[in-house]
A protein has these predicted regions:
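Beta-rich, blade/repeat-based domains predominating
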Residues: 119-130, 163-174, 204-216, 248-262, ...
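Beta-strand-rich domains and repeat architectures in extracellular enzymes and scaffolds
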Residues: 112-144, 159-171, 324-326
Length: 339
């Protein structure tokens, strides 16, 4: 006991007398942690560490203390500082939000034609292949993949999904149809000519299936958040994602997608209005908002009538076709600047 007590006292003395590690805090010189392209960081480290070397990183890429934001993809920006001195390394990290530089432009529509659309179709995906219209519909027990004569609404081919699946967006690439399901963490690949299922694929990072389109090389998938995921065209694995942002905030609830002339046109549940947005896929910038107000009032009004959802571009006619969940009409429109 005589030996143990002095030893314990010595250990306690060392512990109590040991200096604590200095608190590290990054100063950015940015108000509200929100930036746009053209803004300059003024990075400093608030600490009391002596004889140190500091390296700053933006999304794991080394940057200078006075970094200027230029064309980075929008959304969350992670800034890390790694401090090195004779005693080793320490690090600290903060996040900023990179917003769009300018507000989106406003657009409206001009109706050219209206065509019959099955009032029982809970539309989730819409895309043309030549003059043939492909449609994916939702709801458990009612979900289908079908081809249509867009002028008459006649169903040419119909492939029901198992009642356990809730159908979502679709797109056509390399003579294959790719269709999403909502919460089953699974998509399906079909032979375009026959609608025969070839295989399925899992979701990994993206937890739900909403909208789908392609640029001829890769697929773009929405999951109900403000992210659009880029998928490998062969394995359908998520390669990376972009964050969809306005000049004020992230834009969530991105739904049905269509690729047109290098931009993504997307239906969305934002704003409590019948709107679509135009997205720059390289940055995530919302470049335009299309106000489709008034279209819903032109279809048959009934108890199951639901929101605008379904946008397809006809490459030959150079017009858009839009409809909604349980809408009785399919509208052919042009999109024009709003005055």
């Amino acid at each position: 006991m005589k030996v143990i007590l002095p030893l314990i006292s010595f250990i306690l003395l060392l512990t109590c007398g040991s200096p604590s590690k200095p608190i590290l805090k990054i100063s950015t010189g940015i108000k509200n942690n929100k930036v746009v392209w053209g803004d300059t960081l003024q990075l400093k480290l608030k600490d009391k560490i002596e004889n140190k070397n500091i390296q700053f990183y933006l999304n794991e890429r080394p940057i200078k203390k006075n970094h200027v934001f230029t064309n980075e993809p929008l959304g969350t920006q992670r800034i890390k500082a790694i401090i090195t001195n004779d005693y080793g390394k320490r690090s600290t990290e903060i996040s900023l939000t990179l917003l769009a530089k300018a507000p989106p432009k406003l657009f409206t529509y001009n109706i050219l034609n209206s065509f019959p659309h099955k009032i029982t179709s809970y539309t989730q995906g819409l895309e043309f292949d030549g003059d043939l219209l492909y449609e994916s519909t939702g709801l458990n027990g009612q979900s289908t993949l079908k081809t249509l004569d867009f002028k008459t609404g006649e169903v040419i081919n119909n492939k029901p999904l198992d009642e356990s699946y809730f159908g979502e967006g679709l797109t056509i690439l390399n003579d294959k149809i790719i269709q999403l399901t909502w919460k089953s963490m699974k998509g399906f690949v079909y032979e375009k000519a026959t609608l025969a299922i070839q295989k399925s694929f899992p979701y990994k990072s993206s937890k739900e299936g909403w909208g789908l389109c392609n640029d001829g090389k890769v697929l773009y998938k929405s999951d109900g958040s403000n992210r659009i995921w880029i998928l490998d065209p062969t394995t359908y694995k998520e390669l990376r994602s972009i964050e969809v942002m306005t000049h004020k905030a992230p834009l969530h609830n991105i739904n049905e997608l269509e690729w047109v002339d290098g931009k993504i046109y997307a239906n969305t549940y934002q704003f409590n209005k019948e709107v679509s947005v135009i997205i720059d896929p390289s940055s995530g910038t919302v470049e335009g908002v299309i106000d489709f107000s008034g279209l819903k009032e032109l279809v048959e009004q009934h108890s199951q009538l639901n929101v605008l959802n379904g946008i397809a571009y006809h490459k030959t006619r150079k017009t858009f076709f839009v409809t909604g969940k349980n809408w009785s009409k399919l509208f052919e429109v042009t999109i024009e600047p709003k005055e």
